[in-house]
Amino acid sequence: MDEVSRSHTPQFLSSDHQHYHHQNAGRQKRGREEEGVEPNNIGEDLATFPSGEENIKKRRPRGRPAGSKNKPKAPIIVTRDSANAFRCHVMEITNACDVMESLAVFARRRQRGVCVLTGNGAVTNVTVRQPGGGVVSLHGRFEILSLSGSFLPPPAPPAASGLKVYLAGGQGQVIGGSVVGPLTASSPVVVMAASFGNASYERLPLEEEEETEREIDGNAARAIGTQTQKQLMQDATSFIGSPSNLINSVSLPGEAYWGTQRPSF
């Protein structure tokens, strides 16, 4: 091979190699253009792609936010009492006033029932009816040991109102009973009482309810008897007193037979 051919051969090979490299680069460029990625932005896309930790931080939290429905609610404060509410009273009855009359007037004017819980103080000139039926009039000054009773406004009958008192005399004697006359205070008398506005007067016993209760008791007794009869019919072994293999071949009557009169429930 001469020198001329030697000098041209590497140029020929190098030109083919350059042509192939240029063709391959063109294909890669077209492929990137079809995918919508420009060759100059490849490094930027890789640089801006979020890592795993950043992706977790940017992820939107799921579920209800803390404290969204757990806010403390304002307390409900009732500033107005109901008309039928149960109220407590501390009543002070001045000297020389009738304790029983004062309580009756309070119940009538306020249209509320009054339940006397206790009281203390001193009274004079007391008339009481003792448990034996006798009426005793006491003169002098007595200390109140116990005071109880109730007063209802009209239209309740007067028999629904009254006081019961137990007194201690100057010599230590204790006398008590239902007050049937004036109970005059000889010193300020303090009474603890409760009032209510929804009292209703009823006469007992209630005859209609008694009849209803009797009917309910009779229906319950009949239901118990029917249930017992069904249990006897279902349990044929206990009715006949024979083994179950013999009962299958025996025809039982439609109803249980009572040898004697059926007991009443």
From Swiss-Prot:
Residues 83-217 form the PPC domain. One of its GO terms (cellular component) is nucleus. Residues 1-75 are annotated as: Disordered. The keyword Transferase does not apply. Residues 19-30 have a biased composition (Basic residues). The keyword Transcription regulation applies. Keywords: DNA-binding, Flowering, Nucleus, Transcription, Transcription regulation. GO terms for biological process: flower development; root development; vegetative to reproductive phase transition of meristem. Its main location: nucleus. It comes from the Eukaryota. GO terms for molecular function: minor groove of adenine-thymine-rich DNA binding. The PPC domain mediates interactions between AHL proteins. This is AT-hook motif nuclear-localized protein 18. It comes from Arabidopsis thaliana (Mouse-ear cress).
